[in-house]
Regions:
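An acidic/histidine-cluster motif and surrounding catalytic segment
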Residues: 1-71, 75-215
Length: 215
């Protein structure tokens, strides 16, 4: 598989504050081979994001990557990030035939802890930091979005091989505005989402450990 993690960071050129933020997140992390990709402009932010991701995946196919990391410019590493553990989990999820490996989510419907630090998820939101594997490239490229669709919800419709690291290694930094999801513009809203999902996964992890110890 890849030696360094091929990383594509999405940034609207006018959002210089986000560009500076995301460069600071990655500049001292040598395990990532990152490039900043200019986001496709569209009057509907979610459509522009999807089109940008399509362009990235087409590029990844041309470069014959086994997987890539797609990252939005509001991604922020948490203190839980560990280079060797992240790389190990990328390989572990690949052995499970994962389509996506998420660094952190703002919502999920169902979850099952398969191993310490790795959950299978059903229905999620949060594409600020995710590994997408080669097996899913063409499937992603065949996605079509309507004006009222959202890319993460659309992915949920076509994949049941979505996994997430826990504890989260990625959350979304609040900038006071969103180019994709207007409901996330309220102060503290995004932080609350991630706090809630973290607590839910912590409970599921605790219960799994508890019942295993009863055996």
């Amino acid at each position: 598989m890849n030696t360094k993690i091929p990383t594509f960071i999405i940034n609207l050129e006018k959002r210089y504050d986000r560009r500076i933020h995301i460069q600071n997140e990655f500049e001292k992390r040598n395990e990532f081979d990152f490039r900043i990709v200019s986001a496709t402009q569209h009057n509907i932010g979610a459509i522009g994001l999807w089109k940008t991701m399509r362009n990235i995946i087409e590029q990844a196919k041309m470069e014959n990557y086994d997987y890539i990391l797609i990252c939005e410019d509001d991604h922020q590493f948490t203190d839980n990030y560990n280079e060797s553990l992240f790389i190990k989990t990328i390989h572990d999820a690949n052995k499970l035939q994962a389509d996506l490996l998420l660094g952190g989510v703002s919502y999920f419907e169902d979850a099952v802890e398969l191993d310490k630090g790795l959950f299978w998820l059903n229905k999620f939101t949060g594409t600020q930091f995710f590994i997408i594997y080669k097996r899913f490239f063409d499937i992603f490229l065949n996605i079509t979005l309507n004006d009222d669709d959202n890319i993460d919800l659309k992915i949920n419709e076509i994949s049941d091989q979505i996994y997430c690291l826990y504890p989260f290694i990625s959350i979304q930094k609040e900038f006071g505005y969103s180019d994709v999801t207007q409901k996330n513009e309220g102060s503290g809203t995004v932080n609350d989402y991630f706090h809630t999902t973290t607590k839910r996964l912590a409970t599921l992890s605790y219960l799994k450990t508890y019942f295993e110890e009863l055996k």
